[in-house]
């Protein structure tokens, strides 16, 4: 797919910011309009993160116009908003490939472009890295400018506050731009958000921004927005709030700041997520990341082949059903309400629902307090974000044996968001924690049973780990919403096919391809269900009449469930040849889930080939 550039009279002339900086200021508004249209046309045909980029068109143009990139450093926090940046930095002819295998990365990536100073994907990292770069520049006497662009959603994370506190004392030449659009992925939450001078509803973006700015003109007494007051009190020179969709206003203020050499700077910019496309302006949550869509009608394409419900919805339905009978169950999410399937729960049980913002560490220890008080906290969190709260899991939950249930979504391959978002490590980093039980459902019914089991488990924390996407393994487990629930006996696995010679020990949702392989090889197939504790009795029994073991998981081989089986076999002097199949020792790149599972040899054909090749050695 390619996009016809001849209808973009100015944009087609720009391959790098060098050409951009040769334009006169009176042409920049036309460039912004063309860039917005180009983004609309490209994402509607390719899919991708959408609303955030629409809101940063003018800011992106202004930054590359004023600053001498790539010598000067621009750092985009998270990176959802960086599509316009990619288009202006030599990648517009490849923008259609974004998030696809061998295509452009979803987020800024150092390996992709010299203009991408920091590889990102997780939130709130920009200020820390930017401060390090600014200090290094000063020590090398490079006269380089460093600019961090962070959204008001990302500013809720503790790491951002830690960096701001440090930057205010160092007095380095660092500019922090707050892209204040009243949103993260969902609506923002927290006192910082509610105290900022940002209106929750817009009718006309230009008039609303003027109202906000006119009512909050900055003065030396610091009586403006909470954000400006915060930064000013921490030693920053503050400017704003200003209209983030007025290109000339942005350029004027950025030039003034660039020519100032007195310590750290803060610029408060008001933007609107989805700006310039009415459907995205009206519903920026829906249009945060989109499939292909009809640009004229605003109708998103749907996958007509989807026959089963998603694991996220299974979790959300279970949470609602459980809350009907228990007002002490508390659902907690760190700013991932929609993705984790908690919309319905948040609406039906608002007093039992907490969105703690992008604050994974706080989410976990907050759940500890609830558990101590006799409540039943359920933390719904993506695998890749749970990494950010590792100490809290150990120190605040596991050591104290607190009954907190972790619903770990996006375990395994997540697809198009790539290496920063793959759930490749959770079984490895959780398995070594004492007092923790880990369950890996292979289908919809098992997922609900395990959530039910974890909810009733009172002797410590429990984890139910499931992947992104649909629960398609109903071939082995008939299931519907009326099927009764019960607690699974701890550690107990299930033999699904009795074969000979080879035993396949499956952990999680690779059960369906494993079943096909077991039939081909006449191997015994076991759904282990528990990564911790293992079904040691079953493993011992299998060693008595099998000559080889295969462990199978959608997690890093190193330290994963298969490693747990290896450890048990060695400790008990059960010397049976064992092949561990899982994710290899490198960061898994982007690509569709099915595509990446095939490439990694984790579909039926790939698993079969790995086993046969190993047997022949």
UniProtKB/Swiss-Prot annotation:
Q: Which CDD domains match?
A: TPP_DXS, TPP_PYR_DXS_TK_like
Pathway terms, separated by semicolons: Metabolic intermediate biosynthesis; 1-deoxy-D-xylulose 5-phosphate biosynthesis; 1-deoxy-D-xylulose 5-phosphate from D-glyceraldehyde 3-phosphate and pyruvate: step 1/1
Write out the entry's keywords from A to Z.
Answer: Isoprene biosynthesis, Magnesium, Metal-binding, Thiamine biosynthesis, Thiamine pyrophosphate, Transferase
Report any Pfam family annotated for this entry: DXP_synthase_N
One GO MF term attached to the UniProt entry: magnesium ion binding
List this protein's GO terms for biological process: 1-deoxy-D-xylulose 5-phosphate biosynthetic process; isopentenyl diphosphate biosynthetic process, methylerythritol 4-phosphate pathway; terpenoid biosynthetic process; thiamine biosynthetic process
Claim: Metal-binding is one of the keywords in the record: yes
- Keyword Thylakoid, does the record have it? no
Sequence similarity? Belongs to the transketolase family. DXPS subfamily.
Q: What does this protein do?
A: Catalyzes the acyloin condensation reaction between C atoms 2 and 3 of pyruvate and glyceraldehyde 3-phosphate to yield 1-deoxy-D-xylulose-5-phosphate (DXP).
**Protein's UniProt name:** 1-deoxy-D-xylulose-5-phosphate synthase
**Gene name tied to this protein:** dxs
